[in-house]
């Protein structure tokens, strides 16, 4: 029953809805021209009225216009009555409406101006919000800064503290501060304040570097050197090779300052002090270097792309440079002249080289050529001066008979001091002052040479002496040519005796002196040959008497055995076995007389030349 009752109601509602749709369509068709469809659809009363009309009968429809007219007239009359009764209200309403209209215009204008100003106001608000946020952020930062005031102050005072540590030599604390600043830089490198602190700390580190290197330029001991190099390594500004170079440069500057301060007026004093300072301080520097740096091969090979540096070559090159500089100074001072101290100077230099052998820098082998050059140069200079003095004496010499000469008829009998094995000068030279002075000067040169007389100079010394004797021979011949025409028979005999003494006494005596300086056995042992074969190597250690005799042969008397005895006397000495070294080397005694003044024949006693 319930279901049967529900179905008709649904059908009725559907039929009503369909009816309304049809009415609306019909009304739309009828009043298309009078009422737009949108208008009556929007006004419910119009639609309701039209639907009411559509449901009225014909009679009502006929009376409807009249009713509407009457209702209209009635409404108009009511409106008039209302207007008449309330005209003041309408007037006030109109005035109010007009005023409101004006006010609305003002409001509209104000709103327009407001709308025009709103964008700038909006931007100002944004700026205000931004500034407020910045102020708030700054306030927070200021609050945080105030809370961290102590920590910030400590950071800001790092440059001042770093400078104080460096200037007061608190290098350990300075390195800790530098490490802390490097960590700050890695974390906060974008902060300008941190960058400023880093720059100031770098300046202090540069000052610290200068101070440390300056300490190496002073008389610093090994413990202090170790500390300084440790600081430099921790600063990490040099590679290992650069650090070695810096160390050697600084220590070399200190050593050069010491050597430069030595007075240079006296060559012997200068070179002795130079040897002492170089030996002591160079040894200290080498000891310091070896204690600080290791020349062992690295445990790890160098990384790819890295240049391999031979660090040990740095040190050895520096040592070679120092040795070369010392040898240059030594040779310079030796050539300037050191008097008779060549032997003591050689001993000091040898001790210097021996001390360096403990550090692998023995340079004694380089000393021999230096002393040889100086010794032969000094000897050659002395020989040259001797020849020049002989030339001066011969220019003013006059042949005057002397008792020693005139009282003897046999010349060899008057020469008892020229027997083999003796070093006493021939006394017969006293009768001829130029020859005596010449021999004296030669013996002085020999005595100076004896202090430092290496076997290697045998040939050079012999050659220099032969050249000097050859020049003396030429001087004698020049004297003969100049004076021969004015010679008397006595003067001619004296001149012959002069030449005979020169060749038979002076030259053989010089040969014996050469054999004392350069023993033939020692020369043969040095050459590694028997003494009997020494003559095959030329005139080593003896003068060629025949070469000197030849220019004077036309003056001398015809005697075939003039030099036979002397050559036989020299022969055993050249071939004798090497003697045992004496406790003290025999000394070459010069001839007694001094050179005469004004060419007088009288001779005066002269003290013998004494070697140092």
From Swiss-Prot:
Assembly and interaction partners: Component of the conserved oligomeric Golgi complex which is composed of eight different subunits and is required for normal Golgi morphology and localization.
Stored SUPFAM superfamilies: Cullin repeat-like
PANTHER family: CONSERVED OLIGOMERIC GOLGI COMPLEX COMPONENT 8 (PTHR21311), CONSERVED OLIGOMERIC GOLGI COMPLEX SUBUNIT 8 (PTHR21311:SF0)
Pfam families given in the database record: Dor1
Biological function: Required for normal Golgi function.
Protein name: Conserved oligomeric Golgi complex subunit 8
Entry keywords, A to Z: Congenital disorder of glycosylation, Golgi apparatus, Membrane, Protein transport, Transport
Record GO biological process: glycosylation; Golgi organization; intra-Golgi vesicle-mediated transport; protein transport; retrograde transport, vesicle recycling within Golgi
Organism: Homo sapiens
Stretch list, region Disordered: 568-612
């Amino acid at each position: 029953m319930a279901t049967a009752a529900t179905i008709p109601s649904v059908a009725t509602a559907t039929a009503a809805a369909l009816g309304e749709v049809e009415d609306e369509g019909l009304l739309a068709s009828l009043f298309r021209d009078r009422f737009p469809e949108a208008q009556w659809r929007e006004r419910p009363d119009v639609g309701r009225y039209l639907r009411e009309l559509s449901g009225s009968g014909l009679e009502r429809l006929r009376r409807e216009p009249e009713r509407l007219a009457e209702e209209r007239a009635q409404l108009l009359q009511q409106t008039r009555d209302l207007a008449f009764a309330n005209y003041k209200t309408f007037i006030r309403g109109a005035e109010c409406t007009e005023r409101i209209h004006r006010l609305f215009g003002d409001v509209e204008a104000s709103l327009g101006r407001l709308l025009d100003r709103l964008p700038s106001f909006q931007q100002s608000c944004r700026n205000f919000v931004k500034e407020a946020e910045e102020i708030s952020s700054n306030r927070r930062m200021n609050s945080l800064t105030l809370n961290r005031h102590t920590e910030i102050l400590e950071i800001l005072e790092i440059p001042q503290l770093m400078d104080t540590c460096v200037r007061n030599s608190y290098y350990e604390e300075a390195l800790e501060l530098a490490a802390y600043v490097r960590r700050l830089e890695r974390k906060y490198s974008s902060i300008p304040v941190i960058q400023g602190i880093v720059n100031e700390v770098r300046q202090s580190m540069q000052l610290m570097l200068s101070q440390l290197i300056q300490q190496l330029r002073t008389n610093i001991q090994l413990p202090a050197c170790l500390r300084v190099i440790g600081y430099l390594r921790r600063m990490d500004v040099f590679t290992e090779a650069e650090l070695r170079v810096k160390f050697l440069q600084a220590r070399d500057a200190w050593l050069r300052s010491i050597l430069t301060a030595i007075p240079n007026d006296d060559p012997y004093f200068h070179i002795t002090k130079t040897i002492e300072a170089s030996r002591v301080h160079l040894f200290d520097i080498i000891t310091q270097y070896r204690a600080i740096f290791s020349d062992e091969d690295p445990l790890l090979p160098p990384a790819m792309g890295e240049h391999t540096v031979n660090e040990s070559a740095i040190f050895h090159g520096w040592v070679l440079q120092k040795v070369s500089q010392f040898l240059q100074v030594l040779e310079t001072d030796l050539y300037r002249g050191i008097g008779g101290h060549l032997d003591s100077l050689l001993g000091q230099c040898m001790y210097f080289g021996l001390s360096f052998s403990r550090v692998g820098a023995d340079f004694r082998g380089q000393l021999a050529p230096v002393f040889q050059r100086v010794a032969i140069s000094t000897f050659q200079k002395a020989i040259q001066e001797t020849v020049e003095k002989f030339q001066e004496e011969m220019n003013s010499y006059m042949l005057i008979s002397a008792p020693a000469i005139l009282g003897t008829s046999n010349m060899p009998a008057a020469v008892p001091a020229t027997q083999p094995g003796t070093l006493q000068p021939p006394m017969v030279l006293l009768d001829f002052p130029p020859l005596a002075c010449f021999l004296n000067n030669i013996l002085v040169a020999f005595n100076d040479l004896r202090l430092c007389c290496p076997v290697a100079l045998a040939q050079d010394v012999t050659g220099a002496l032969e050249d000097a004797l050859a020049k003396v021979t030429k001087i004698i011949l020049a004297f003969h040519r100049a004076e021969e025409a004015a010679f008397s028979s006595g003067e001619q005999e004296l001149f012959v005796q002069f030449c005979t003494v020169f060749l038979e006494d002076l030259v053989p005596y010089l040969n014996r002196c050469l054999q004392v300086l350069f023993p033939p056995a020692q020369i043969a042992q040095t050459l590694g040959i028997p003494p009997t074969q020494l003559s095959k190597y030329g005139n080593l250690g003896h003068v060629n008497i025949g070469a000197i005799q030849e220019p004077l042969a036309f003056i001398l008397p015809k005697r075939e055995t003039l030099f036979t005895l002397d050559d036989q006397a020299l022969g055993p000495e050249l071939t004798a076995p090497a003697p045992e070294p004496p406790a003290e080397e025999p000394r070459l005694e010069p001839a007694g007389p001094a050179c005469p003044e004004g060419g007088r024949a009288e001779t005066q006693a002269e003290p013998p030349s004494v070697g140092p």
